[in-house]
Amino acid sequence: MPNLYEKYVLPRLIDAACSQPPMSKLRSRYVSQARGEVLEIGIGSGLNLAHYGAGVTSITGVDPAAELTVKAAERADALSVPVSVLGISGEALDLDNNSFDTIVCTWTLCSIPNPYRAVAEMYRVLKPGGQMIFVEH
């Protein structure tokens, strides 16, 4: 169970730090390239949601941090495409093989204990000919 800092302070700090103009510029540049059915690994507070373009038909976001995904669900309400947020890790995606056209992962691999497993899972659920969009530091 998260302590008070993890539940209330840390999510706000992460959201504030990750919404700074340089990061928003990169989000806009890369996330806007997504198309079709999208899987976002590490949706967090949903900062990428505003940057998806008209070619996106649905978004499934995964993140094990429930404290962050509350804000993502709020931001999803402003979109015209269906968005579902799942409280699962990118290392163990309970999703069908070959089910997404685009996978987006921004500033997330560094926080996943086994990034190799997460990338293997992403590849498993990516449709043939699909694209992966990574932004990392």
Walk through the language-model features, giving the residues of each:
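A short SAM/SAH-binding and catalytic strip from SAM-dependent methyltransferases
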Residues: 101-114
